[in-house]
């Protein structure tokens, strides 16, 4: 199967991947192309920009969490009704799980998808030396097809031309465009990285302005040509994560989505929907009641610490969620969702805001990142998503700390080594119907996660 596709990779973090990937995606969309957008790795924020730019949900591709077949299935799933795929890389091109185990790198994903790569290079502090960097990236792994280069943070057109000529002379790799230094093109950041698209503001106009800049200095037609000359796609895996025909809805699951909670893998939502859950959305910040006739609740991660005052003040929603938990409704809360279920959130300025109180203890924001990285875990006790002994892969990234309450633990961490043996996650409620954890799970690691959540939700309310 032939399908145009391109990977936008950087030589490091902060090389401009999200800015340029979003701009190219928006430029292609503006021209009428239906773009399937993807983000390598476990990040939640960058996909929001790509979703906005493509006007279509972005999927995460993670070969460490999912493995080759599941990751490839997610890729094919995202191609439906699209005509070109754009994949934004993660960190530097070759950065993966570790030096000895390079799984999860942009290079590995590009290789598994047989996709050509456009390499981004920040040239703000170099000239001809840019050629040496590109040459090194090309020679490190000849299996990776670096088909073009984009130069970011050029000081002037003359600066760009010096770098372009050197790269094309010494590497025979075409330079397909550049961006000048321009603070107006910088995406705002906060403690978890870039600001999320769910926080509102003028992001739609920002994306369109970005697309206009991209079109003026980057050769979109040349990028299209590179994408169209990609080799045939690898064989499509047999359906495993998604049913060939979506199941009839058997229950309704409410998804918390607003400025406070927006961290969801699109595949998680699609798997729930395709395996039999009708999804409905609500806002813990703005709504005063839960959607009617629901069998389960999913509260993802996000920035509850930024919206803590508003969450705390919405007593009607807190009461509704507490009652749902006490009534035995299945509730799954990840990271920011876990913080919302705790007694209170203490923000960076030591202000304390009361939350639901389903989970004993106060979630306290730390001055530095508390835990970060890929994680393997074994299920320690049966819960609404998985049975005892199941091994899961996920990702942890949080600045808050919650003293371990005396509740039943959900998981035992196996990896990385510094966390091995630690308990993670909490099972709460008289009927153990609430699961809260800092561990972000991609349901593609095990489709039974989605199926089990649907099963227990149907047990509470069936359509």
From Swiss-Prot:
GO molecular function: ATP binding; cobyrinic acid a,c-diamide synthase activity
Domain GATase cobBQ-type: 252-448
Active site residues of this protein: 335
Record-linked Gene3D superfamilies: 3.40.50.880, P-loop containing nucleotide triphosphate hydrolases
Cofactors (names): Mg(2+)
Enzyme class: ligase
Enzyme Commission numbers on file: 6.3.5.11
InterPro entries: CbiA/CobB_synth, Class_I_gatase-like, CobQ/CobB/MinD/ParA_Nub-bd_dom, GATase_3, P-loop_NTPase
SUPFAM superfamilies: Class I glutamine amidotransferase-like, P-loop containing nucleoside triphosphate hydrolases
Catalysed conversion reaction: cob(II)yrinate + 2 L-glutamine + 2 ATP + 2 H2O = cob(II)yrinate a,c diamide + 2 L-glutamate + 2 ADP + 2 phosphate + 2 H(+)
UniProt site positions, description: Increases nucleophilicity of active site Cys: 440
Keywords of this entry: ATP-binding, Glutamine amidotransferase, Ligase, Magnesium, Nucleotide-binding
Disulphides: none
Transmembrane annotation, as ranges: none
Gene Ontology terms: biological process: cobalamin biosynthetic process
Tagged with keyword Ligase: yes
Coiled-coil intervals: none
Additional detail: The a and c carboxylates of cobyrinate are activated for nucleophilic attack via formation of a phosphorylated intermediate by ATP. CbiA catalyzes first the amidation of the c-carboxylate, and then that of the a-carboxylate.
Domain notes: Comprises of two domains. The C-terminal domain contains the binding site for glutamine and catalyzes the hydrolysis of this substrate to glutamate and ammonia. The N-terminal domain is anticipated to bind ATP and cobyrinate and catalyzes the ultimate synthesis of the diamide product. The ammonia produced via the glutaminase domain is probably translocated to the adjacent domain via a molecular tunnel, where it reacts with an activated intermediate.
Functional summary from the UniProt entry: Catalyzes the ATP-dependent amidation of the two carboxylate groups at positions a and c of cobyrinate, using either L-glutamine or ammonia as the nitrogen source.
Alphabetized NCBIfam families for the sequence: cobB (TIGR00379), PRK01077.1 (NF002204)
Recorded family membership: Belongs to the CobB/CbiA family.
This protein's name: Cobyrinate a,c-diamide synthase
């Amino acid at each position: 199967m032939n399908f145009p596709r391109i990977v936008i990779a950087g030589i490091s973090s902060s090389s401009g991947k999200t800015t340029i990937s979003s701009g190219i995606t928006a430029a292609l969309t503006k021209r009428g192309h239906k773009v399937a957008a993807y983000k390598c790795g476990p990040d939640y924020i960058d996909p929001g920009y790509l979703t906005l730019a493509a006007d279509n949900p972005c999927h995460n591709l993670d070969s460490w969490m999912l493995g080759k077949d599941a990751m490839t299935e997610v890729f094919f799933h995202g191609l439906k009704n699209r005509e070109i795929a754009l994949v934004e890389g993660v960190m530097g091109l070759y950065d993966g799980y570790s030096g000895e185990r390079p799984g999860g790198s942009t290079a590995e994903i590009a290789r598994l998808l047989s996709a050509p790569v456009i390499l981004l290079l920040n040239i703000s502090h170099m000239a001809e030396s840019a050629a040496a960097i590109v040459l090194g990236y090309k020679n490190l792994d000849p299996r990776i097809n670096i088909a073009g280069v984009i130069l970011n943070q050029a000081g002037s057109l003359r600066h760009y031309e010096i770098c372009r000529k050197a790269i094309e002379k010494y590497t025979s790799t075409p330079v397909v465009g550049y961006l000048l230094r321009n603070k107006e093109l910088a995406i705002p950041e906060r403690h978890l990285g870039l600001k999320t698209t769910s926080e509102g503001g003028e992001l739609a106009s920002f994306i369109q302005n970005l697309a206009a800049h991209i079109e003026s200095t980057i050769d979109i037609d040349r990028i299209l040509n590179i994408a169209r000359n990609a080799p045939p796609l690898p064989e499509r895996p047999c359906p495993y994560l998604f049913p060939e025909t979506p199941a009839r809805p058997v229950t309704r699951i409410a998804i918390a989505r607003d400025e406070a909670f927006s961290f969801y893998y699109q595949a998680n939502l699609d798997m729930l929907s395709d395996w039999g859950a009708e999804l409905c959305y609500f806002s813990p910040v703005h709504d005063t009641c839960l959607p009617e006739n629901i069998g389960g609740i999913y509260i993802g991660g996000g920035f509850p610490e930024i919206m803590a005052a508003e969450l705390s003040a919405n007593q009607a929603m807190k009461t509704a969620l507490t009652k749902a938990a006490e009534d035995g409704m299945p509730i799954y809360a990840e990271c920011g969702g876990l913080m919302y279920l705790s007694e209170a959130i203490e923000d960076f300025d030591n202000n304390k805001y009361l939350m639901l109180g389903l989970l004993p203890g106060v979630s306290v924001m730390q001055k530095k990142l508390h835990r970060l990285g890929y994680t393997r875990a074994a299920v320690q006790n049966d819960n609404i998503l998985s049975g005892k002994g199941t091994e899961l892969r996920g990702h942890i990234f949080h600045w808050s700390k919650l003293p371990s309450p005396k509740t039943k633990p959900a998981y035992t961490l196996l990896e990385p080594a510094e966390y091995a043996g630690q308990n993670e996650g909490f099972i709460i409620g008289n009927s153990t119907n609430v699961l809260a954890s800092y561990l972000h799970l991609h349901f593609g690691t095990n489709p039974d996660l989605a199926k089990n959540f649907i099963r227990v939700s149907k047990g509470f309310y069936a359509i």
